[in-house]
Amino acid sequence: MTAQGFLLIATFLLVLMVLARPLGSGLARLINDIPLPGTAGVERVLFRLPGVSDSEMNWKQYLCAILGLNMLGLAVLFFMLLGQHYLPLNPQQLPGLSWDLALNTAVSFVTNTNWQSYSGETTLSYFSQMAGLTVQNFLSAASGIAVIFALIRAFTRQSMSTLGNAWVDLLRITLWVLVPVALLIALFFIQQGALQNFLPYQAVNTVEGAQQLLPMGPVASQEAIKMLGTNGGGFFNANSSHPFENPTALTNFVQMLAIFLIPTALCFAFGEVAGDRRQGRMLLWAMSVIFVICVGVVMWAEVQGNPHLLALGADSSINMEGKESRFGVLVSSLFAVVTTAASCGAVIAMHDSFTALGGMVPMWLMQIGEVVFGGVGSGLYGMMLFVLLAVFIAGLMIGRTPEYLGKKIDVREMKLTALAILVTPTLVLMGAALAMMTDAGRSAMLNPGPHGFSEVLYAVSSAANNNGSAFAGLSANSPFWNCLLAFCMFVGRFGVIIPVMAIAGSLVSKKSQPASSGTLPTHGPLFVGLLIGTVLLVGALTFIPALALGPVAEYLS
């Protein structure tokens, strides 16, 4: 990796930390149930109108509110996509989606995955994009943040049974965090040249004298929350490599910052609410170390070029296949790691065209559970599961009952932690096996051999871990793949949220014990190393056999 690559990573992380720190303080106020200045009156009016109670909920009530909102959104979006030809803002007269594609798309956006088995500009109307997908981009992001709010309160409250009010949290997260920041980002994108209109597609004459139909639409408004909410679904098929979505190098840098902004701010907020900012910094250090190493590996692999092209005598000093020439290899490598470390899935380069090792790293980042910064909310509660596991392992080594932030971690919490951690690996490995065992699964593979298996493994990993990016060589728009991936997305999202909320319900009722000489410090470099080791160990033991059949075999062949 060149000095330019190091400078790019350092600049990105520096700007990220500067922006995330004040946002973290604002999020800490919301976690502590302190309204932001000037918002209390608005909140009272908004709750009185529908008659919603703002009293606190136990973990089951909180969970039911989150699940109820998401199930309602799933049903509304599903029927909206089926009948989009009856709805307004459809200047191209696009038909409704098939039932399997509508189901896949609805589940995808409700679960914050944004897997797309379709091309946006030829499949969805402006109304479906705006009133359907963009709305779910906000709600799915707010749902993930609300869950981590509840879990943080569980660690910091003592001898209580309630975790806050889900409706209050969802309202505050949406109105005072997601909407204002997304609005600022959208205005910046428009200023830089991103589209924002409701015009019919425009026929233009090219410099060669041919005619081309240019897609239009309300792009910038969807693009902003797509990145900020770590959603990732593109308005166009080319996603963020399309100049109408991502027109300049500056918008590209802002998009990467937006992906990591809230996950980073939540780490700062956790430290503030816990009363020990070192706890939040510990999580950031662990995430950042894994992130920097992964970026370095991808940059190194892509700068080496494609060995198969070199063997044919072609000039392939760097691997530019599938990459936008506006951004180049280093920026494309950084973006690939950012979008897969977080559960975003937006792309500016085709991951299917990366080298074997360059494509394996994004796949592995998804497989370990999207815990390196991760999705908004989901990344931090996923990492907290590994924190509990690391504390448990340390307790076994020193012969003490494991505890974290003064709360003892008992058998119930560890069973739920193990269940939550095992959900996505089970979906990935069994889903990939099912796809390879069936003709319907194998027929979607564009390439034979190890790379074809990598396409399958990447798709199931992306769906189960709610990322949404793809090795695009897989032809996934079929009833088999739409249903398989919809199942993986649904269980991968809510199959983790349910045990996380149960853990929160168990922890909030416990009393914190004062630290003693035998208490394991969870804020220093020793615990950072233990946490990183736990993440790597679980990832290695679970996925090395599958990776050996895919990208590793491709690299060695």
UniProtKB/Swiss-Prot annotation:
Taxonomic lineage of the native organism: Bacteria, Pseudomonadati, Pseudomonadota, Gammaproteobacteria, Enterobacterales
Annotated family: Belongs to the KdpA family.
Subcellular location: Cell inner membrane
Disulfide bonds: none
Function comment: Part of the high-affinity ATP-driven potassium transport (or Kdp) system, which catalyzes the hydrolysis of ATP coupled with the electrogenic transport of potassium into the cytoplasm. This subunit binds the periplasmic potassium ions and delivers the ions to the membrane domain of KdpB through an intramembrane tunnel.
Organism: Escherichia coli O17:K52:H18 (strain UMN026 / ExPEC)
Name of the protein in question: Potassium-transporting ATPase potassium-binding subunit
Pfam families, alphabetized: KdpA
Keywords for the protein's UniProt record, in alphabetical order: Cell inner membrane, Cell membrane, Ion transport, Membrane, Potassium, Potassium transport, Transmembrane, Transmembrane helix, Transport
Alphabetized PANTHER family for the sequence: POTASSIUM-TRANSPORTING ATPASE A CHAIN, POTASSIUM-TRANSPORTING ATPASE POTASSIUM-BINDING SUBUNIT
InterPro entries membership: KdpA
NCBIfam families the record matches: kdpA
GO cellular component term of the entry, any: plasma membrane
GO molecular-function term, one example from the UniProt record: potassium ion binding
Transmembrane segments: 5-25, 63-83, 132-152, 170-190, 253-273, 283-303, 329-349, 356-376, 379-399, 416-436, 484-504, 526-546
Subunit structure of this chain's protein: The system is composed of three essential subunits: KdpA, KdpB and KdpC.
Bilayer topology annotation: Multi-pass membrane protein
